[in-house]
Design a protein with these regions (language model features):
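Short glycine-rich or small-residue beta-strand-to-loop segments that form or flank ligand, phosphate
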Residues: 6-16, 75-81, 107-113, 139, ...
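N-terminal phosphate-binding or glycine-rich loops at protein starts, especially the Walker A/P-loop
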Residues: 2-53
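Acidic/polar active-site rim loop that often engages polyanionic ligands
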Residues: 140-153, 180
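Accessory alpha-helical/coil subdomains and C-terminal extensions
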Residues: 100, 108-113, 119-134, 154-221
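Short, ordered loop/turn segments at secondary-structure junctions
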Residues: 12-14, 41-47, 81-82, 114-115, ...
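Short glycine/serine/threonine-rich phosphate/pyrophosphate-binding segments
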Residues: 16-26, 48-49, 92-95, 115-123, ...
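Short coil/turn connectors at secondary-structure junctions
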Residues: 2-7, 33-36, 71-74, 104-108, ...
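Glycine-rich oxoanion-binding loops at beta->alpha junctions
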Residues: 1, 51-107, 116, 144, ...
Length: 221
């Protein structure tokens, strides 16, 4: 497989510790497969609709820059929380986006994100197929919630799970120093899934018994 045309990549939703590693991976793979240019959306699909697009070849012009990107926190290209409408209801943003794809000779679009980002790339793919477009639309999973279907461990989940286990261990140890007993309740992110809450069990070890109770949305309490 080779990509003789240009590639476009964007980031969306909340940043994770490894979202820029995925961006670096897309860039390196696209160049290895012959992409003439790799463009980046600034501030996701919302920024793209405002014409905010950069040539990543100008920014990632040597190996050191790419290696630094892999270890850079937050979202290098910026992010957004923007959902595309149903094209049957409002086709205007789709027309605008496909005009931009044509202007920059885009042959493949990568969108790095979670549930809403996958919804965006799915809508673009369906719209393109309906219009006979040959552009390939590819979703790159990213979510600390670990709640994307058919994905065992989403990039970002492991880092968040480790962070939660570390924080809970510190909270438990701090709470144990007082003679007066207390009850501490920690509310963990995760949308509608309990993967992150379950990761709190990793706080248990030789120096800590871990949480007394872990409540998961999948199990009634």
């Amino acid at each position: 497989m080779s990509w003789g045309t240009n590639v476009l990549v964007g980031q969306s939703g909340g940043p994770t510790a490894v979202i820029n590693s995925s961006l670096a991976g897309v860039y390196e793979a696209a160049k290895a497969l012959g992409a003439a240019h790799v463009y980046g959306m600034e501030y996701g699909i919302q920024g793209l609709l405002q014409g905010k697009i950069v040539d990543l070849d100008d920014r990632l012009d040597d190996k050191m820059e790419i290696e630094l990107l892999k270890r850079t926190p937050s979202s290098y290209l910026g992010s957004c929380r923007f959902k595309l409408p149903n094209p049957a209801t409002d086709e205007r943003p789709f027309v605008q986006l496909f005009e931009l794809f044509a202007k920059y000779c885009i042959g493949a679009v990568f969108y790095i994100g979670g549930n809403d980002s996958m919804d965006t790339i799915a809508k673009l793919s369906a719209y393109g197929a309906a219009k006979g477009s040959e552009i390939r639309f590819i979703g790159v999973p990213k979510t600390i919630d670990n709640d994307l279907m058919y994905t065992d461990h989403t990039p970002g989940y492991g880092s968040a799970a480790k962070y939660i286990a570390t924080i809970l261990k510190e909270v438990i140890c701090d709470s144990s120093v007082y003679d007066i007993r207390s009850v501490t309740v920690a509310e963990i992110m995760g949308r509608h899934t309990g993967w992150l809450a379950g990761a709190a069990s990793l706080a248990a070890g030789a120096d800590c018994n871990g949480p007394d109770i872990i409540l998961l949305p999948e199990r009634p309490f």
